[in-house]
Amino acid sequence: MQLTVKALQGRECSLQVPEDELVSTLKQLVSEKLNVPVRQQRLLFKGKALADGKRLSDYSIGPNSKLNLVVKPLEKVLLEEGEAQRLADSPPPQVWQLISKVLARHFSAADASRVLEQPQRDYERSLSRLTLDDIERLASRFLHPEVTETMEKGFSK
């Protein structure tokens, strides 16, 4: 089937692919045609991001469909890859192990793992956004909890 892939900058290409082609293979073809590295590509169909491991047919993409290509900045890709590598390299903290045990009682191993990923990403994102001022405030609250309590009582009057 014939597909059109259009980048936001206006470049586009037409590709001939089977309906059951993997998204990852399509990205490779787009890389060759538009000279955009695979790891910087994000393909969208009707506003939905396409996952590398899925097939075009999984998204009901048919002949003459138009896909949008978002090119991620290289810096963002490197940061994402670095964060993923850091998470993979570090042993899970005890809290994640405990949460994992609780989830394992209620979900299959695969589902429990997927459920756990989101809070871990949120936690990592929150930590990476802490400023020095935020850290100083937290440290002050831990080291001098009585001052924080006094201030809170003063505000509640």
Swiss-Prot record:
Give the principal location in a single coarse category: cytoplasm
Q: Domain of life, per the record?
A: Eukaryota
Location of the Glycyl lysine isopeptide (Lys-Gly) (interchain with G-Cter in ubiquitin) covalent cross-link? 48
The subcellular location is: Cytoplasm, Cytosol; Nucleus
Signal peptide positions are none
Q: How is it modified after translation?
A: Polyubiquitinated. Ubiquitination by AMFR and deubiquitination by USP13 may regulate the interaction between the BAG6/BAT complex and SGTA and therefore may regulate client proteins fate.
Gene Ontology annotations of biological process type: post-translational protein targeting to endoplasmic reticulum membrane; tail-anchored membrane protein insertion into ER membrane
Which keywords does this chain's UniProt record carry?
Cytoplasm, Isopeptide bond, Nucleus, Phosphoprotein, Transport, Ubl conjugation
Where do the record's region annotations for Required and sufficient for interaction with BAG6 lie?
A: 96-138
The record describes the protein's role as: As part of a cytosolic protein quality control complex, the BAG6/BAT3 complex, maintains misfolded and hydrophobic patches-containing proteins in a soluble state and participates in their proper delivery to the endoplasmic reticulum or alternatively can promote their sorting to the proteasome where they undergo degradation. The BAG6/BAT3 complex is involved in the post-translational delivery of tail-anchored/type II transmembrane proteins to the endoplasmic reticulum membrane.
What is annotated about its quaternary structure and interactions? Answer: Component of the BAG6/BAT3 complex, at least composed of BAG6, UBL4A and GET4/TRC35. Interacts with BAG6; the interaction is direct and required for UBL4A protein stability. Interacts with USP13; may be indirect via BAG6.
Protein name as annotated? Ubiquitin-like protein 4A
Query: What is the native source organism of this protein?
Result: Pongo abelii
Q: Which gene encodes it?
A: UBL4A
